[in-house]
């Protein structure tokens, strides 16, 4: 499908320079490839005290990780980094899950529970908007992304963000203090510590 589409379509639309470069390298297609970045809806600023009470979290006192529980998202690195923090009453909240339970997602959930991480499962609507409205920061430690919509959503809520320095995240154009070297748990912990101090 991908190969045929890239070779025979009159035009190809991509969502990031990373994917544009991939198509050029992999399929030698450089002409009539159009870059159109993803957008996100206007943020819905809200509170949901009952939901926060249910989760055991407080406004402004949690780091938010929001994505599918897949190995390439490196949420295990986020948990390891969180355990290194002098976090006080700041918690780590992981919003998301997996569509198909596998060894990685099961291990991640066990690791999270042992570290006292709050797992919300998949969330949307008012619950999701309240998590984005009130987070201390958003973190995305991924090793692979096309163009991370979750990062764009977090930025639309004016959250401080801490993200890996992979090409797709670099393409967003954040200041250098928002990035850490992908896979470096100590560097991730140092960035997070600065945000919560």
Q: Where are the predicted features?
A:
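Membrane-proximal helix-turn-helix segments that form the acceptor-binding/catalytic region
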Residues: 1-11
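Helix-loop-beta element that forms the nucleotide-linked donor phosphate-binding surface
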Residues: 8, 20-40
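Conserved donor-binding/catalytic core segment of Leloir-type glycosyltransferases
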Residues: 56-83, 93
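Nucleotide-activated donor-binding/catalytic signature segment of Leloir-type glycosyltransferases, i.e.
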Residues: 105-126
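Short alpha-helical donor nucleotide-sugar binding micro-motif in glycosyltransferases
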Residues: 122-123, 130-135
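Aromatic "clamp/platform" in nucleotide-sugar-dependent glycosyltransferases that forms part
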Residues: 141-143
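Short hydrophobic beta-strand element within catalytic cores of glycosyltransferases
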Residues: 160-163
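Conserved acidic donor-binding segment of nucleotide-sugar-dependent glycosyltransferases
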Residues: 178-185, 193-196
């Amino acid at each position: 499908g991908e190969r045929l589409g890239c070779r025979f379509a009159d035009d190809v639309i991509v969502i990031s320079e990373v994917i544009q470069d991939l198509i050029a390298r992999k399929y030698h297609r450089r002409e009539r490839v159009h870059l159109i970045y993803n957008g996100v809806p206007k943020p819905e600023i809200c509170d949901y005290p009952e939901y926060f009470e249910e989760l055991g979290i407080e406004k402004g006192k949690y780091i938010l990780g929001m994505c599918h529980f897949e190995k390439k998202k490196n949420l295990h690195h986020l948990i390891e980094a969180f355990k290194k923090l002098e976090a006080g009453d700041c918690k780590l909240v992981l919003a998301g899950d997996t569509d198909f339970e596998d060894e990685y997602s099961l291990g991640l959930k066990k690791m999270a529970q042992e570290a006292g991480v709050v797992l919300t499962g998949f969330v949307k609507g008012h619950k999701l908007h309240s998590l984005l409205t009130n987070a201390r920061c958003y973190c995305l430690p991924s090793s692979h992304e096309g163009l991370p919509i979750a990062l764009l959503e977090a930025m639309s809520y004016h959250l401080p963000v801490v993200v890996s320095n992979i090409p797709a995240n670099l393409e967003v154009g954040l200041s250098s203090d928002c990035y850490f070297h992908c896979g470096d748990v100590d560097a991730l912990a140092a960035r997070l510590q600065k945000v919560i101090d």
